[in-house]
Amino acid sequence: MAVQIENLGSLDRKMTLEFARADLAKAREARLAKVGKSMKMAGFRPGKVPKNLVEKQHGMQVDFELQFDKAAELFYELAQKEGVALAGQPRLEPKSEIDAEKVVFDAFFEVLPEVKIGDFSKAEVTKYTTDIGEAEIDRALDALRKQQVHYHPRGEAGPHGDGGSNTAAQNGDQVVINFVGKIDGVEFAGGKAENFECVLGEGRMLPEFEAATLGLKVGESKSFPLSFPADYHGKDVAGKTAEFTITVKSVNWAHLPVVDDAFALSLGVTEGGVTKMRAEVKENLDREVKRRVTTLLKSEVMDKLNSLCELDVPKSLVASEQERLVEGARQDLMQRGVPNAKDAPIPAEIFAEQATKRVRLGLILSELVKNQNLIATADQIKAEIDEQATTYEDPKEVIRWFYRNPGRLKDIENLVLEDNVIKYFTSQAKVNDKSVTFEELSKLN
């Protein structure tokens, strides 16, 4: 049949589909027979309902299903024949006029857009560099030591000493306090606690509480005013000033493990002691630097691609991406243990901007991969899997885990494709190298 495709706009199209009702006769008979085998009706044994009654009860529904199935089949057949680059699924609408001989549908759909790739040579991106030295390793080890911190009462002799002669609370100390707050001499909800534990200097307490606690010894108390802002979430105290009194119940100083072979062993370094531990810490920091640098560069390149390339975005693809993001949000809520998260009413509109950007970038990347032959090779995929596997205790098992699942392999392939696009982009654009410290790198977004 001659294909009629009408241009309804930038990407919107309409295809008119026609087929003879007679083409569905055999399928209709078979479908009704299948329905009849399981049909139940009073006065008849199951599966023994006369054909005319099956036809009367289910004929219209069967016609509806078969016509839509046939229209969909014909649409995809003709779209492939005409070389139509589809963006999403069609919306099929039967013509309102009834024709005894034929069935006519209108298929409304979108086509993939033309992607106009911009001039990458005019773009500039920043590539950060960071050197890991002894100071960075020492800071990382300090963080690991703090994970094994334990506390001893100030002034009491123990296996690690007494914490010094000063028994007053200091920054870094773990304190246990009771406190009570009053407004106009009356206690208020949420303004009282007993055995409240925190570490001074970590910012868990309000600054006024920390300032009042510093310098106090066990058994000592102190009162201080605290003004609640006008927009405070607790309406009963918003805009008011409370008088708090704290009493210190215990003051404990922090003892950190010594960086020695025993400490290395506690981190799983069974051979090589401190030397091997420092080497492994450096290796982990180097890996983190590479990951962070790559993430920052990728984010900037993607933003540049988004601004340099021109295309119309198919609404159908954006809608599908919004639904994926909604489902992802529900899954996240479920993992957090939120009640009834599976059916949470999350409006797709809140993801409109994010979904549009994702679809744009997906189409741009596809165009670049196709035009510049940036496909992911088997060697590249293997190299990426091998590198990811090195961070695990049993790399060989992790490698097998990747190759056992086509979905996981596809994720790796997409990651390699993105890397290929970034390499191509940076080969065309101006890249400014910028050296930063590890701490500075960690704070960059």
UniProtKB/Swiss-Prot annotation:
Its EC number is 5.2.1.8. Pfam families: FKBP_C (PF00254), Trigger_C (PF05698), Trigger_N (PF05697). It is found in: Cytoplasm. Disulfide bonds: none annotated. One of its GO terms (biological process) is cell division. Coiled coil: none annotated. Residues 172-257 form the PPIase FKBP-type domain. It comes from the Bacteria. It catalyses: [protein]-peptidylproline (omega=180) = [protein]-peptidylproline (omega=0). Gene3D superfamilies: 3.10.50.40, Trigger factor ribosome-binding domain (3.30.70.1050), Trigger factor, C-terminal domain (1.10.3120.10). The keyword Cell division applies. Keywords: Cell cycle, Cell division, Chaperone, Cytoplasm, Isomerase, Rotamase. Its main location: cytoplasm. GO terms for cellular component: cytoplasm. GO terms for molecular function: peptidyl-prolyl cis-trans isomerase activity. Consists of 3 domains; the N-terminus binds the ribosome, the middle domain has PPIase activity, while the C-terminus has intrinsic chaperone activity on its own. Involved in protein export. Acts as a chaperone by maintaining the newly synthesized protein in an open conformation. Functions as a peptidyl-prolyl cis-trans isomerase. Belongs to the FKBP-type PPIase family. Tig subfamily. This is Trigger factor. It comes from Polynucleobacter necessarius subsp. necessarius (strain STIR1).
